[in-house]
């Protein structure tokens, strides 16, 4: 069997090659991660959470008021649960280290409720569509 570039092979016999670009913002887009130290602390927290949840972080960037992640995780995990794990645990751990942050945020929430999730692939939708359509002639 030819190996698929960037695919993750599981002992159970399935292969997945799905990558997600995740973005979420701080509550009210407040600039919370304003120093290199704070950005690094958040990167470390997110990396720890990923390791505990079988999530592979391929790229990470912490901006003043939002997070960018390029991640991959087993198909049995849902995007919603992955984001919930990141946001929930990171907020709890962040407030333990920086309790003064709560005063900057009404209601004491670090993150807004919303997030963006987009799939990222090495083939465009059009390439996949043409490949599938081409399978008809291979019968």
Summary of predicted features, one role per range:
Residues 1-139:
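Basic nucleic-acid-binding interfaces
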């Amino acid at each position: 069997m030819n190996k698929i570039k960037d695919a993750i092979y599981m002992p159970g016999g399935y292969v997945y090659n799905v990558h997600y670009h995740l973005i979420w913002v701080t509550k009210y887009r407040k600039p919370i991660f304003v120093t290199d130290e704070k950005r690094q602390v958040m990167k470390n927290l997110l990396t720890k959470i990923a390791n505990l949840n079988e999530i592979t972080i391929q790229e990470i960037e912490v901006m003043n008021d939002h997070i960018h992640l390029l991640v991959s995780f087993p198909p049995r995990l849902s995007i919603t649960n992955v984001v919930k794990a990141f946001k929930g645990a990171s907020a709890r751990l962040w407030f333990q280290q920086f309790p003064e942050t709560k005063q900057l945020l009404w209601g004491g929430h670090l993150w807004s409720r919303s997030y963006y999730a987009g799939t990222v692939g090495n083939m465009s939708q059009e390439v996949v569509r043409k490949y599938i359509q081409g399978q008809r002639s291979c019968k």
